[in-house]
Amino acid sequence: RPSFCNLPVKPGPCSGFFSAFYYSQKTNKCHSFTYGGCRGPGNRFRTIEECRRTCVG
């Protein structure tokens, strides 16, 4: 799995409300969160399928 999968989830500094997904190393699963729309770490995916394919394996 890519190292960015282990980055902490952060919504970013903007105030948008976008549905996104992140990988949790603790649970070895992808979870949803609200993304603000800009910046934030690389542990962010548009779909749960993309998150699973990239980080879960």
Swiss-Prot record:
BPTI/Kunitz inhibitor domain segment(s): 5-55
Domain of life: Eukaryota
Principal subcellular localisation of the protein: secreted
Subcellular location: Secreted
Entry annotated with the keyword Zinc: no
Tissue spec. comment: Expressed by the venom gland.
Keywords: Disulfide bond, G-protein coupled receptor impairing toxin, Secreted, Toxin
InterPro entries (UniProt xref): Kunitz_BPTI, Kunitz_BPTI_sf, Prtase_inh_Kunz-CS, TFPI/VKTCI-like
Disulfide bonds: C5-C55, C14-C38, C30-C51
Note on domains (UniProt): Exploits its two major loops and engages more positions in its interaction with V2R. The pharmacophore defined by numerous amino acids positioned in loop 1 (9 to 18) and loop 2 (34, 39 and 44) may be at the origin of the absolute selectivity of this protein for V2R.
Family of the protein in this entry: Belongs to the venom Kunitz-type family.
The name this protein goes by in its record: Mambaquaretin-6
Protein species of origin: Dendroaspis viridis (Western green mamba)
